[in-house]
């Protein structure tokens, strides 16, 4: 008899753009068939966090996550790097993960010179802090530099995802003195299709979803 698929708890994904839904659904189908994803989208969370700072959305975030848990989610994955730290420290009784933590750990493992690229300025500081946190956790030295890819976010918001990705790829290809390039936002992932640099270009959706899947299997009810 074929092996039964491993049981897992539903995963609620908190997005600040609906564009992330097909990305994570495709990764689920390719890497984690049978994993139940429940998508929550609130674009205003990012807009407010950009205006007032990530902590300004803590109350709304807690309410959304508590609602997802009340409806049966066993794990929450926040796919927005700007508010990821706020989400991660929200106690709703189930694991709350930020999508970019596994990517940050991989960047630290690649070497001490890490370049963070972002298309939204509010993402730079949280991502740099995360890489530095992972370096302390690993006991490794790290030098993190950060750069904003100008005009790319406007293209993304206008629906020109390829145009955004190509600008990000150009910025990545201009980096030569690094051991890893971190694409700070999940929305930047497709830039990997256009890069030619020999420096590893890391994105968050695949390793982030893998971490959520592991947590979902661990949280599944027995039987």
Question: Which residues does each PLM region occupy?
Answer:
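Non-catalytic structural scaffold of enzyme domains
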Residues: 1-223
């Amino acid at each position: 008899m074929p092996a039964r698929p491993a049981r897992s708890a539903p995963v609620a994904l908190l997005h600040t753009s609906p564009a992330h839904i097909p990305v994570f659904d495709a990764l689920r189908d390719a890497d984690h068939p049978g994993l139940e994803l429940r998508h929550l989208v609130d674009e205003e969370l990012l807009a407010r966090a950009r205006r007032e700072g990530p902590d300004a959305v803590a109350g709304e975030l807690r309410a959304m996550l508590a609602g997802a848990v009340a409806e049966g989610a066993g794990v929450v994955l926040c796919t927005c790097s700007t508010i990821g730290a706020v989400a991660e420290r929200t106690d709703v009784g189930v694991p709350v993960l930020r999508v970019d933590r596994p990517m940050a750990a991989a960047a630290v493992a690649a070497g001490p010179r890490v370049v963070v690229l972002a298309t939204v300025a509010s993402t730079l500081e949280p991502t740099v802090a995360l890489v530095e946190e992972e370096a302390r956790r690993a006991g490794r030295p790290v030098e993190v530099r950060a750069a904003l890819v100008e005009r790319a976010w406007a293209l993304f918001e206008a629906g020109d995802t390829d145009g955004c990705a190509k600008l990000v790829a150009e910025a990545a290809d201009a980096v030569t003195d690094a051991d890893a390039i971190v694409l700070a936002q999940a929305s930047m992932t497709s830039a990997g299709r256009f890069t030619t640099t020999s420096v590893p270009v890391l994105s968050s959706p695949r390793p982030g979803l893998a971490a959520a899947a592991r947590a979902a299997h661990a949280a599944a009810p027995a039987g």
